[in-house]
Structure formats: structure tokens, C-alpha cells
Amino acid sequence: MKYFDKIAKVYDSWYTTKTGSYVDKTEKELVLSLLKIKKGFSLDLGCGTGNYTLELHKKGFEVIGLDSSKEMLRVARKKVPEIFFINGDAYFLPFKDQVFNLVVSITMFEFIKEPTKVMKEIYRVLKPGGEVLIGTMNGRSLWFLFKRIKSLFVETAYRYARFYTPKELKNLCQKAGFKNIETRGIIFFPSFFPFTQLAFKLDRKLNRIFKNFGAFVVVRAEK
């Protein structure tokens, strides 16, 4: 997507803000807590600037990052030069069958037109017993509503995005043949909310009570 080539150099700047830092930390905590596989060969699908590629590398995984944006990959390679990054297509993954123990894809599915096709490719490249984690914006959250309205007036990535509910993500996994499917959601306040320490604490409490209603939803499944 050309839009991501255009914003690649400034993409990570949001994570340096107070809200961005909190969101990034909270989302990563959730994703990493859901991992049952602790080592092996992993693919960060739609890796962008390599944020999750780096996290998987730190956890001891052998990891490859794949993205369709050459400019995002240029940033990723500078950030983590020791990791192999590929400019590729999620619809036609350039790997043999049953290669990976783990596939992680964070905020990529919002921007693909044929999610069923991509899920089949993920299933194909995973080893038996391998797992997939997909993180997207939740289509039923306050955060989604704010992002969608904002994109009508200011060009953002979310103007081109499709948002999923936990049920839709489960259905995608089931159709592809995955089993042991679970979903979790986090981040309840929209991004314009003043994230004070009190708000952080309240948000974390809500995360524990309402596991599928946060702005960011993750589905985990096994082959």
C-alpha cells in the first residue's frame, strides 16, 4: 500500500507519545502473554517497521519479517539489521509448506482485501502444532469509532482499513482449519482520552473484566 511507503519515516513517532507508549506496551504484553510456543522459527507477517519482529527476536525466536512496503522495510532493516526482512505478498507467501512454528500478524489484516486467502497461506506455512496470533483493531470499540470518523477529515491509514470483531476473527481461523481458538481484547479508552495514571489503572482493570471488548483484539489459534 503506497500510503505506508509515504509515512514510513514517521510511523514510529506515535510510540514516543504518552498514549502511544502505553498502547504499544499494553498490546505487546497481551500478544506475548498468549504465546504458548516459546522458541522456534517464526514469521512476522506485515511486519512494518519491525516492532514485533524485534520483540520475537528478543524472546529467542529465529524470525523473518515480511511486508509489502519497501519503505517500511527500509526502516525495519536499520532498526534490526541482524534480522532477515522480505518484501513480499501475504497472498502468496514465498515459503515452502510447514516451515514455521509461529506466525504473528499485528495490524495487517485491516488492510487486506482477501483475508480468507491469507489465512490459508498462514495455515500452509505453519508446521503441525504451530500457532498463529493475529492482532487487529476491534470493529465494536470506541477507539474504532473515533479513528473511523477522524479518517473522514484527515488522511490516515484507517481510511483504508476494515475492522474485525472477535467473532469474525474466530470464523476466519475456523474456515482455514485452525483449532483451539481464543480471543482477547484490550485498551478501552479512545486515543483522545487523557491517559493519566488513574486512566492507565482503570484501563488495565477493564482489560481483565471485559476480555473481548477492547480496541485491540487478538486471536490465537493452533494448526
Annotate each predicted stretch with a short phrase.
Residues 43, 49-92:
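Class I SAM-dependent methyltransferase SAM/SAH-binding core
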Residues 104:
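A conserved beta-strand element that flanks and buttresses the S-adenosyl-L-methionine
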Residues 107-111:
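Short catalytic micro-motifs in class I SAM-dependent methyltransferases
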Residues 151-168:
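Acceptor-substrate binding/catalytic loop of class I
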